[in-house]
Swiss-Prot record:
BP GO terms, sorted: anaerobic cobalamin biosynthetic process; methylation
Name of the gene this protein is made from: cbiD
Reaction(s) catalysed (UniProt annotation): Co-precorrin-5B + S-adenosyl-L-methionine = Co-precorrin-6A + S-adenosyl-L-homocysteine
Protein name: Cobalt-precorrin-5B C(1)-methyltransferase
Pfam families: CbiD
Stored HAMAP family: CbiD
Root EC class: transferase
Pathway per the UniProt entry: Cofactor biosynthesis; adenosylcobalamin biosynthesis; cob(II)yrinate a,c-diamide from sirohydrochlorin (anaerobic route): step 6/10
Length: 372
């Protein structure tokens, strides 16, 4: 028999970033090379000072087969299973691993292993050609390896290769290809901890998408809630993928980022229901944080001539799409009305030099409202 759902759900469990996994595995592999001790657990210190033991699934010596006289042919590798807690992270359950070699020159050199991408476009925090290992994870690894070197009186350096098993396929489910990060995933994290449903990585990718487009000379961007609205903007303006920002429910992340990274023209396009939430002042369009206000839609329709019968029908509608269809049948442009209110909300946030416009679509991606 199926168990009852508890009235009070258990607290959501936090997890650890790929940056934390990379730090633990690189530390364990380096320690094996310097001490001969293979670890089952690697304890790391997160940026805010928390000490975290990370279990390892392997820690072993390997033969790199390298002929460089300035480095050791022998290396070591260690791996851990990425635990994202209760966050719906694409990398949850993947094996993140590090391969480490000792080199003569002090410091740490980073390389992209299997499943980790390489930066191919300007506009990110990393230079073109660099492995997609973000600055905080790089610092975490560098700090831990420097401390280990001091403990062991080791004066050389480390070559660290980070990989993710299956990462090339997983990366296709992320924004990396559009950002110009090719061949795999990014090694991410600023605190070392994944907060369930914080969506910080998604919001960061939205900001990166805007930054990359600007750095590559694009002055007109379209931020879209999903595939249908994105297809509508691609067809309407002929914009390339790099200029199409997949914002999902996070329209606020796009609008607020315009203060730091403005563009000449910003087109916001989304399903009618999503845009009706923005029109009501909501900047997070997810159903758990905002809802469609049919009463408000009826009031707006009334301002443009809807009779009492139509107002009542809109209030009683099963969906926002039904509401807009009822209005259109009586020549009340509810799609345009919602776009005008959404545009007013957006203009109150973005700098005046950003020319914003709104587009609403139906479920098939047809444009059913606009405001400029």
């Amino acid at each position: 028999m199926r168990e009852e759902t508890p009235e009070q759900p258990a607290p959501l469990r936090s997890g650890y970033t790929t940056g934390s996994c990379a730090t633990a595995t690189s530390l364990a592999a380096a320690r094996l090379l310097l001490t001969g001790v293979a670890s089952d657990v690697a304890e790391i210190v997160l940026p805010k000072g928390q000490h975290v033991p990370m279990p390892l699934v392997f820690c072993r010596l390997i033969d790199n087969g390298n002929d460089n006289d300035n480095s050791s042919d022998a290396g070591a590798e260690a791996g851990t299973i990425k635990d994202a807690g209760d966050d719906p992270d694409v990398t949850h359950g993947a094996v993140v691993f590090a391969r480490v070699r000792l080199v003569a020159a002090p410091g740490v050199t980073f390389r992209a292993g299997p499943g980790v991408g390489t930066v191919t476009r300007a506009g990110l925090t990393l230079a073109v050609g660099e492995p997609a290992i973000n600055p905080v994870p790089r610092k975490m690894m560098t700090d831990h390896l420097a401390e280990l070197a001091a403990e062991q009186a080791y004066g050389g350096g480390f070559e660290v290769t980070i990989g993710v098993e299956g990462g090339e396929a997983l990366a296709l489910k992320t924004m990396n290809p559009r950002l110009g990060i090719l061949g795999g995933l990014s090694i991410l994290g600023t605190t070392g901890i994944v907060r369930p449903f914080s969506c910080s990585a998604y919001i960061a990718s939205i900001h990166q998408g805007i930054d990359v487009a600007r750095a590559n000379g694009y002055t007109h961007l379209a931020a879209c809630t999903g595939n249908a609205s994105e297809d509508a903007m691609r067809a309407h303006y002929g914009l390339p993928d790099i200029a199409l920002i997949e914002m999902g429910d996070f329209v606020g992340a796009v609008l607020k980022h315009m203060k730091r990274a403005p563009v000449e023209r910003l087109s916001i396009c989304g399903g009618f229901g999503k845009l009706s939430k923005l029109a009501a002042g909501h900047l997070d369009l997810h159903s758990r944080n905002s809802s469609i206000d049919l009463e408000q839609l009826a009031q707006w329709a009334a301002e443009y001539g809807a009779d009492t019968a139509l107002q009542a029908a809109i209030r009683a509608a099963n969906t926002s799409q039904q509401a807009v269809a009822l209005a259109r049948a009586q020549q009340v442009p509810l799609g345009d009305i919602v776009c005008r209110h959404a545009l007013a909300v957006a203009r109150a946030i973005v700098p005046p030099q950003v020319n914003v416009e709104m587009f609403a679509t139906d479920r098939q991606g047809n444009l059913i409202g606009a405001a400029q």
